[in-house]
């Protein structure tokens, strides 16, 4: 039991509403420290989590020359300097290479290595996240979160000070409650140091998604659960806790904490309101979880064995030494609400108009007579002009629709095959009939930005924001600026992904 003084100190930190700039004086980790459970890992690409922190939040690497830059808060305790990233990455692509630990323990997160499962990058590593996939504002100031696509993950297998064995710990994360899937496993927290499944109870991490292979909550999900290894748990039962609700706030606070034969799940709208407790009780009723056998590595976006099929968005999170009180966590939630997370535009460059017919012209020298078209389900570039046949003009024309998965972006419906849309499948663009599934909608949603070569637009995949419409050998792909596929070649990338959009031929 925390002394009343500690609880009051934690509350005063968060609720005193003494402000500098846009954020209250105390950060989440100041509040945890006041409550007697200090942060041993503190990760955020959006803001400082200590009032005095002015060091780097994250590192980006740009595609044009491989140079890196650290992005720090605008001021101590403040919001990230997104303008510094925008300037550094102007006219090229950028990836998030390091998410720095603000606790001083050096528990930085970097590209996850292979483990029980291999990632899609060379040598089995996971992908790195786009630096622009998750723009937000905090108190009106722009920042970027970490948009985790399937195959993307970060890890630290040599963390310092994190809980091991049955030692107590707490953790929270601010996530996008609308970005998830049912694959394993979008986690943040404590995992195995070997990147392999070493048995029941060897993890304690926040999970978010609608996976139903192990435990579930009420409704159809998504749920906040705990990945304790060899199971996603919503409570003491390995199967179901009806008290763990489906929850999908755009900004979501997720909390998991555990100590000897006790653990809890809590959650809230990160933009307003207070935390609710969805489970508080004994460890799971099956063997291997009492006592726990935590190993102390840190993961983001993946499972403990590097299962990397999940997706989600991470804005900030911490891990603590000791089991935080509800009062401390309530004060942290008040701080998160005071940060005023809000959405920001996913698009830039020349505007598109929903309902209009467009054609997309290549800008690569030597290919400027070619437009995005289709031959059946194959999407390619073809030479099109005002004197082309009506059939070809229709094949090279697309109706702009509101994004099927995100209304801030767009989907492109065929003019000559109504009901069929451009979508990527295995990163090859194809024309397919809308089957109404969540997966189709996500694969068929694209976000235009100012063209990387200074002309027109580059068309970015919403669910894989490192990937863009690219023509390669006159076939269309969702390509990244460097990668394992031949169509990811860096040569001519900026030209190949830039398109001049005009009124449709048909």
Curated annotation (Swiss-Prot):
Protein origin, superkingdom: Eukaryota
Compartments (UniProt record): Secreted
GO cellular component annotations of the record: extracellular region
Keyword Disulfide bond included in the entry's annotation: yes
Disulfide bonds: 29-39, 89-94, 184-185, 409-447
Span of the signal peptide: 1-26
Region (ABD): 344-506
Pfam families: AbfB, ArabFuran-catal
GO molecular function: alpha-L-arabinofuranosidase activity
Site (Cis-peptide bond): 184-185
Family the UniProt entry places it in: Belongs to the glycosyl hydrolase 54 family.
Role of this protein: Alpha-L-arabinofuranosidase involved in the degradation of arabinoxylan, a major component of plant hemicellulose. Able to hydrolyze 1,5-, 1,3- and 1,2-alpha-linkages not only in L-arabinofuranosyl oligosaccharides, but also in polysaccharides containing terminal non-reducing L-arabinofuranoses in side chains, like L-arabinan, arabinogalactan and arabinoxylan.
Domain commentary: Organized into two domains: an N-terminal catalytic domain and a C-terminal arabinose-binding domain (ABD).
Name of the protein: Probable alpha-L-arabinofuranosidase B
Gene label: abfB
